[in-house]
UniProtKB/Swiss-Prot annotation:
It is found in: Cell membrane. It comes from the Bacteria. The gene is lepA. It is a peripheral membrane protein. Keywords: Cell membrane, GTP-binding, Hydrolase, Membrane, Nucleotide-binding, Protein biosynthesis. PANTHER family: TRANSLATION FACTOR GUF1 HOMOLOG, CHLOROPLASTIC, TRANSLATION FACTOR GUF1-RELATED. This is Elongation factor 4. Residues 17-198 form the tr-type G domain.
Length: 619
């Protein structure tokens, strides 16, 4: 067993040869945060009495869902063969929506621990992050976690991992994050296998931002990895992508609580506080340099995160609109990938059109708005960005079905995605059938082992963002895992389907869909609304239309009042007169009457799953 470091290296005065920067790559639920907890305990940076499960996941949603959303960086001392080392563990998100954050975290490291559940084997998203790590030429340490589980099959999955990375099955370490078995051997392996950082200590300072977090009291806390030179407190620094300059008010390392230091030298990982109040000022992937002696070239690899999925968010109570605006402004401080603009809908009132990285991002933002700011929201069906070329060659970018141009259209381009699906061999047929139905093109298939297959498809992004994942899980009994990334676009035969209530268009229900699926969408939506809209005193037609052509129709039957109840016997002409009068009244009502769509109908009709219908039922 390696003892705890007796005199740990001091930040800003640490020789790069004793620094080890590494991250943990793992799928959701494979035990990454639990293993991180054991490392914090083994290295003694967290006292046993302060320990709590998932120590590094600070957000409530992170702890409840058991996922990591924001990256964290922790400095831990560890001693091997009498030499004291400083280990910097950078905790990365495991979900596909946060791939850009993962790639920046990987760029800050020299090595990665590939953590795989010994009872489940490798998943699609872990594979995607593993390929990212290999692109960054990181030293990979394969590790099987949860070996204490009764269902664990370490020998089988060790062989699978070994064939993937190209090592021997004996080289795959076996640990248990729960009991702590093998954690110390893993820390020793980190020191021995991962190289120390390379960098020029005398060059002008260059540091890469791999995360920034908004703190209510101190403004934005920026996490950086220093590549060249050094950063000291009270000096002026410059962000290379925006050219803005700031004074460093505080500089330090997380261990795992923030500890101010006298600076950060080449190869070290720590945090900076400049008093900035907005995360957009310190962008993930940007390069920080000294203002007086700036570096000539940035570190490269920086890109603005692009929203892939758009959805309208509207408060159920219209008076909550200012609260929603403030709430989005606050979330934006901590989430540079969030974009939004105000939008009005005839049916739903005032709200925002919000851009997200993916469906999980959408769900998390919505949940945080509802939970942290106590808002009740309706979100419209998610859609992607289309490029529409009209006949006069004008190109229109459409993020909302209501922006889809009328009249003659030359072509519509839709974004595509490369999807990787890992699935047990017996479900290949079901998965291929689903992807074919979603207009996907098969790109390739590889057997990872005798039982598990990796299938690659090129598939329209619009098909993935709606309910693809739910259907994939139900067809494979929950065994499939999916990873996707945006990959070009293609020309497609897309049309806008409008829903008309008594001849009037309801903008919230419009959808852009493939011509082959338009009829199915129309029938589904008209059928749903027929059940949800209350009956009127007159017949109400619900129609689905493409342009001026009606493709589906349902009628809501009229409620009929019995006007003859007061006639006991008597002449037939008296009864006829009353019936004619009722008929006239209904005709007049139909001309002037407006159908109000109740709020519950919107919630139920716009939810792709049963959740909205349940919510409506509660009301």
């Amino acid at each position: 067993m390696s003892p705890l470091a007796s005199n740990p290296p001091v930040p800003a005065a640490t020789d790069p040869s004793v620094i080890r920067n590494f991250c943990i790559i793992a799928h959701i639920d494979h035990g990454k945060s639990t293993l991180a907890d054991r490392m914090l305990q083994a290295t003694g940076v967290v006292q046993p009495r302060d320990m709590k499960a998932q120590y590094l996941d600070r957000m409530d949603i992170e702890r409840e869902r058991g996922i990591t959303i924001k990256s964290q960086a922790v400095r831990m001392p560890w001693s091997v063969d009498g030499v004291d080392y400083a280990l910097n563990m950078i905790d990365t998100p495991g979900h596909v929506d946060f791939t850009y954050e993962v790639s920046r975290s990987l760029a800050a490291c020299e090595g990665a621990i590939l953590l795989v559940d010994a009872a489940q084997g490798i998943e699609a998203q872990t594979l995607a992050n593993l390929y990212l790590a290999m692109e960054h030429e990181l030293e990979i340490i394969p590790v099987l976690n949860k070996i204490d589980l009764p269902a664990a099959d370490p020998d089988r999955y060790a062989a699978e991992l070994a064939s993937l990375i190209g090592c021997e099955p004996e080289d795959v370490l076996r640990v248990s994050g729960k009991t702590g078995v093998g954690v110390e051997e893993l820390l020793d392996r980190v020191v021995r296998a991962i190289p120390g950082p390379e960098g020029d200590a005398d060059a002008p300072a260059r540091a890469m931002i791999f995360d920034s977090v908004y703190d209510t009291y101190r403004g934005v806390v920026t996490y950086v990895r220093v590549v060249d030179g050094r950063l000291s407190p009270r000096e002026k620094v410059r962000m290379m992508s925006t050219g803005t300059t700031y004074e460093l008010l505080e500089i330090g390392v997380s261990s795992p609580e923030p500890v101010p230091t006298k600076g950060l030298a080449a190869g070290e990982v720590g945090y900076l506080i400049t008093g900035v109040k907005d995360v957009r000022q310190s962008k993930v992937g940007d390069t920080v340099t000294n203002h007086a002696h700036p570096a000539e070239q940035s570190l490269g690899g920086y890109e603005d995160p692009k929203p892939m999925v758009f959805s309208g968010l509207y408060p159920i109570d219209g008076s909550d609109y200012p609260v929603l605006r403030d709430a989005l402004d606050k979330l934006k401080l901590n989430d540079a990938a969030l974009v939004y603009e105000p939008e009005t809908s005839v049916a739903l009132g005032f709200g925002f059109r919000v851009g997200f990285l993916g469906l999980l991002h959408l769900e998390i933002v919505r949940e945080r708005l509802e939970r942290e700011f106590d808002l009740d929201l309706i979100s419209t069906a998610p859609n992607v960005v289309y490029e529409v070329t009209r006949e006069d060659r004008e190109v229109v970018t459409v993020t909302n079905p209501s922006e889809f141009p009328e009249g003659k259209i030359l072509e519509v381009r839709e974004p595509m995605a490369s999807a990787t699906i890992i699935v047990p061999a017996e479900f290949i047929g079901a998965v291929m059938e689903l992807c074919q139905a979603k207009r996907g093109n098969l790109k390739g298939m590889d057997y990872l082992s005798e039982e598990r297959v990796e299938i690659r498809y090129w598939i329209p992004l619009a098909e993935i963002v709606f309910d693809f994942f739910d259907q994939l899980k139900s067809r494979t009994k929950g065994y499939a895992s999916l990873d996707w990334k945006a990959d070009g676009d293609q020309v497609a035969d897309l049309v806008k389907v409008d829903i008309l209530l008594q001849g009037e268009q309801v903008d919230a229900f419009s959808s852009i869909t493939h011509r082959d699926n338009a009829y199915a969408y129309g029938v589904m939506m008209t059928g749903k609304l027929k059940e949800l809209i209350p009956r009127q005193q007159y017949e109400v037609p619900i129609q689905a239309a493409i342009g001026s052509r009606i493709i589906a129709r349902e009628n809501i039957r009229a409620i009929r009042k019995d006007v003859l109840s007061k006639c006991y016997g008597g002449d037939i002409s008296r009864k006829r007169k009353l019936l004619e009068k009722q008929k006239e009244g209904k005709k007049r009502m139909k001309m002037v009457g407006r159908v109000e769509v109740p709020q519950e109908a919107f919630i139920a009709a716009l939810s792709s799953d049963g959740a909205g219908a349940d919510q409506a039922a509660k009301k």
